[in-house]
Amino acid sequence: MLTKMYVALIKNLTLQDFRDRYAGSVFGSLWALINPIVMITVYLLVFTEIMGARLAGSSNLSSFSIFLISGLLPWLAFSSTLTRTASAFQEKKSIITKIKVNLSFFPLYICFSEFITLLISVIFFIFVYVLFLKQDINILLVLNLLILFCFQQLFAYSLGLLFGVLNVFFRDIKEFLTIFMNIWFWMTPIVWVPSIAPEWLQKIQENVNIYLWFLSEYRGIFLEGNTSSIENFGPLFLIAFLVLSTSLILIKML
C-alpha cells in the first residue's frame, strides 16, 4: 500500500516533473497554459475560419474543430503517460538505486503530471467551447469527463508499467513503443472521420482498438452532450485491472 513516504515522494516528483518541463524558460510553468491556448486557437482558426471544415450533416461551423480537439487533447496525455511510464525505471535509475521505493507505484508521478497538463488544456478548451463556440456543457458532463480521464490515465499507466518492466529485460522496447504509438495514433480516428475508413477497418477498430471507446465517449460529450452509461466502464476497468495485475506480477521478478 502507499505509505506517507511514498505519497510524499510521488507528490514531490509530480511537482518537480511539472516544473522541469519549463525549467530555465522565461515564462516557466505558464507555458503549460500558453501551449494549449496557442494549439486550440490555431486549430479553430485553420479548420473553422480558414478551411470552414465541418462534419457531414452538421450545421455547426466548428463541428470538425470540436471533433479534432476533443480527441487530440486526451490522446496526447494518454500517449505521453504510456511512453514516459515505460521509460521511468531506466530514466530514474539513480533515484531507485539510492532510495528503497515500491516500483509498482513509483512511476505514478508521470500519470499525475500528465493529468494536470491535460486538465489545464481541457479547462481552456471548455472555456472556448462555451464562451466563443456558444456550446452548452453542464456539471454532470464535466464530472463524466473527469471520470473518463481517470480511467484513461489508469489504462495508460497500466500499459506503461507493463512495457516498463519489459524494457528492463529488452531494451528494444523503447524504440518499438515509439513506432507502435505512432501507428496506433494514425490507425485511430483522431484526425480523420471514422466513416471514411473501409468497412473492414471499421470492424477491426471496433473489436481491437480499445482507445476508440474513449474517443467515442469524449466526442459524445462535446458533440452530442451525451453521458457515458455506467456499464461501459466495467469492461474497460477489467482490462486495465488485468494489465496492471500482470505488470505487478512481472515487477516482482525485478
Regions found by a protein language model. Give the residues of each.
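Hydrophobic transmembrane alpha-helices and immediately adjacent juxtamembrane helices
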Residues: 1-254
